[in-house]
A protein has these predicted regions:
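Acidic, Ser/Thr-rich low-complexity intrinsically disordered segments
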Residues: 143-189
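N-terminal and secondary-structure boundary signal
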Residues: 90, 110, 114, 164-167, ...
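Loop-rich catalytic cores of soluble enzymes, especially ATP-dependent carboxylate-amine ligases
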Residues: 1-83, 104, 133-136, 154-158
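Intrinsically disordered or highly flexible coil/loop and linker segments, enriched in small
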Residues: 70, 74, 103, 124, ...
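Short secondary-structure subsegments characteristic of cysteine-rich extracellular domains
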Residues: 106-127
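Flexible helix-coil linker/hinge segments at domain or subdomain boundaries
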Residues: 120-148
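Extended, compositionally biased alpha-helical segments that mediate assembly or anchoring
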Residues: 190-288
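Glycine-rich, often proline-containing surface loops adjacent to acidic residues and nearby aromatics
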Residues: 87-101
């Protein structure tokens, strides 16, 4: 993830291992239990009881920013690390995927197919433990691509050697294509998604970001105006769509109503103060 935007500079000091789940849990747990002198000053100077949850390097593990995070879908109020510790990993949360502004729901079907195939590719590919140098190398590559990915001929580091984003990307796509040929999945759709990605790597003018630039410049409008116009167009599309609701829409609406009912139950049933709730959440529901 880029260093542009919201930052917690203390996180730059963290080296959270992705080699083993136990290491990931232990190191994040240590960060949530280690007091930061910098954050301690906030607690002592503001005079507000709940100016922050705690003065630790991480207040809770959810504050840790990374491009992906292991998650548990176990339904409980326990903290995420405790759920991971007791129930394992159910899914991977991808946190650095740009929305496609030209798609009403933010992502296209072929994009979803590509992500599915890419995750399967990552799962089956040999992955050795990362050392500190390799972890920093990955971090530096992420920063370069997130900030300068549109620059022609951008070079990043692969095993201490330089390689262009384009060449490495094409290597990965070739390996993903081999995976399709060896599996029983619906090959045609996945081949199409790979073909689309390959074209964008070979010609960055075909990427959504390039289309954004072109429309903003050609229309002589600001980025904000561009976003507003696109949002209005998507809104009209939804409003003008068929009155018949899809199964997904019904599921979402049912979930909204269920959440409202559960919220009211909590309000009426709980006499616990926020202070007690916070102590219970931070202490009783943390991993062992």
């Amino acid at each position: 993830m880029s260093d542009i935007g919201y930052q917690n500079t203390k996180q730059k000091e963290l080296q959270i291992s992705l080699n083993k789940l136990s290491e990931y849990i232990d190191q994040l747990k240590a960060a949530t239990n280690t007091t930061s002198n910098e954050f301690l000053k906030i607690e002592n100077s503001h005079g507000v009881e709940f100016s922050q949850l705690s003065p630790n390097v991480l207040q809770i593990e959810d504050e840790y920013y990374s491009s992906s995070r292991p998650k548990s879908s176990y339904n409980s109020e326990d903290r995420m690390l405790k759920k991971l510790q007791e129930h394992g990993v159910d899914y991977i949360e991808l946190r650095s995927i740009d929305l496609n502004p030209f798609k009403p729901c933010g992502i296209g079907y072929r994009n979803l197919l590509f992500l599915e195939l890419f995750l399967i590719y990552c799962l089956q590919k040999d992955s050795f433990d990362l050392n500190d140098y390799e972890t920093k190398e990955i971090r530096n590559n992420d920063l370069l691509v997130s900030k300068e990915g549109r620059r022609p001929g951008l070079m990043i580091t692969k095993s201490k050697s330089k390689i262009s984003v384009k060449d490495w990307g094409l290597e990965i796509l070739d390996e993903m294509e081999e995976l399709i040929s060896e599996s029983n999945i619906k090959k045609e759709l996945f081949y199409e998604s790979l073909s689309e990605s390959r074209k964008m790597l070979q010609d960055p003018n075909l990427t959504p970001s390039s289309e954004v630039f072109s429309q903003v410049i050609d229309s002589n409008i600001s980025y904000e105006e561009f976003g507003k116009n696109l949002g209005e167009a998507h809104k009209k599309q939804y409003l003008n769509s068929s009155d018949s609701k899809s199964d997904n829409e019904r599921v979402i609406e049912n979930e909204i109503e269920r959440s409202k009912v559960e919220s009211e139950k909590l309000k009426n049933a709980s006499e616990e103060s926020f202070k007690d709730y916070l102590r219970n959440y931070l202490i009783d529901k943390k991993p062992k």
